[in-house]
Amino acid sequence: MLGLGHDVVDVPAFAKQLNEPGTRMRNLFSMREIWQTAQRSQLKHDDEAVHLAARWAGKEAFLKAWCAAISRHAKDGAEVAYPYTLDNFPWVRIEILDDSHGVPRVILSSEVQRKVQQSLGLPLDPVCQSYDISISISHDGPIASAVVMLEI
């Protein structure tokens, strides 16, 4: 295991932030994520915010798993250099999408995939990803949660 991340989202607070006038929260999701959550919301007869909150937890959990992996990879006493800050993290380029069986997956843009490989000292191979990303997302009542594990 390279890194493990977990995040919990308060769904009502997230929904309030998502619906505030002038908010940019929706810009942190790809069009595919927004489309999928709208479809899932219709199918489940519930609020779209529930499904977006779970995906937001997934993005946060991925970031935490990646940071944990970078910290573990650093040499003893070495300064840890993270590729992004919270201000320039490319949230929209980390997608949490369901596959054809409804199983959530983390989909990284090629730029983010390259940064992950570089930051962890993994081979740069655009065709064959040298690591796996496992994700589990859930929501129950007012809470959405996600766990992400990076592994070789």
UniProtKB/Swiss-Prot annotation:
EC identifiers of the protein: 2.7.8.7
Enzyme class, UniProt record, top EC level: transferase
Binding site for Mg(2+): D7, E60
UniProt catalytic activity: apo-[ACP] + CoA = holo-[ACP] + adenosine 3',5'-bisphosphate + H(+)
Alphabetical GO biological process terms: fatty acid biosynthetic process
Keywords: Cytoplasm, Fatty acid biosynthesis, Fatty acid metabolism, Lipid biosynthesis, Lipid metabolism, Magnesium, Metal-binding, Transferase
HAMAP family for this protein: AcpS
Function: Transfers the 4'-phosphopantetheine moiety from coenzyme A to a Ser of acyl-carrier-protein.
The name this protein goes by in its record: Holo-[acyl-carrier-protein] synthase
